[in-house]
């Protein structure tokens, strides 16, 4: 009897975890629409048509836009 109870609890825990994970049991995301991945957001940049004065272009964004990253400090001219 104790073996059956532990087996049942294991099955219940696995089913709860499968339901709560975003990818499901095998990693498929069929119920949710997957958004396109933008590399610019990984570096906390913004996609713009032109970068501002204190930003640098690092990568390209979709639709031929520029990925603008802010400098860590304000750069002053000498």
Swiss-Prot record:
<comment type="function">
    <text>Has antibacterial activity.</text>
</comment>
<dbReference type="InterPro" id="IPR025933">
    <property type="entry name" value="Beta_defensin_dom"/>
</dbReference>
<feature type="signal peptide">
    <location>
        <begin position="1"/>
        <end position="23"/>
    </location>
</feature>
<dbReference type="GO" id="GO:0045087">
    <property type="term" value="P:innate immune response"/>
</dbReference>
<feature type="disulfide bond">
    <location>
        <begin position="47"/>
        <end position="61"/>
    </location>
</feature>
<dbReference type="Pfam" id="PF13841">
    <property type="entry name" value="Defensin_beta_2"/>
</dbReference>
<keyword id="KW-0929">Antimicrobial</keyword>
<protein>
    <recommendedName>
        <fullName>Beta-defensin 29</fullName>
    </recommendedName>
</protein>
<keyword id="KW-0044">Antibiotic</keyword>
<feature type="disulfide bond">
    <location>
        <begin position="40"/>
        <end position="67"/>
    </location>
</feature>
<comment type="similarity">
    <text>Belongs to the beta-defensin family.</text>
</comment>
<keyword id="KW-1015">Disulfide bond</keyword>
<feature type="disulfide bond">
    <location>
        <begin position="51"/>
        <end position="68"/>
    </location>
</feature>
<dbReference type="GO" id="GO:0042742">
    <property type="term" value="P:defense response to bacterium"/>
</dbReference>
<dbReference type="GO" id="GO:0005576">
    <property type="term" value="C:extracellular region"/>
</dbReference>
<keyword id="KW-0964">Secreted</keyword>
<keyword id="KW-0211">Defensin</keyword>
<keyword id="KW-0732">Signal</keyword>
């Amino acid at each position: 009897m104790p073996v059956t109870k532990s087996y049942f609890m294991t099955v219940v825990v696995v089913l709860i975890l499968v339901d709560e994970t975003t990818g499901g049991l095998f990693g498929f995301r069929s119920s949710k629409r997957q958004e396109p991945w933008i590399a610019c957001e990984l570096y906390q940049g913004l996609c713009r048509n032109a970068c501002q004065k204190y930003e640098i272009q690092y990568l390209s964004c979709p639709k031929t836009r520029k990925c603008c990253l802010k400098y860590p400090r304000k750069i002053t001219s000498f």
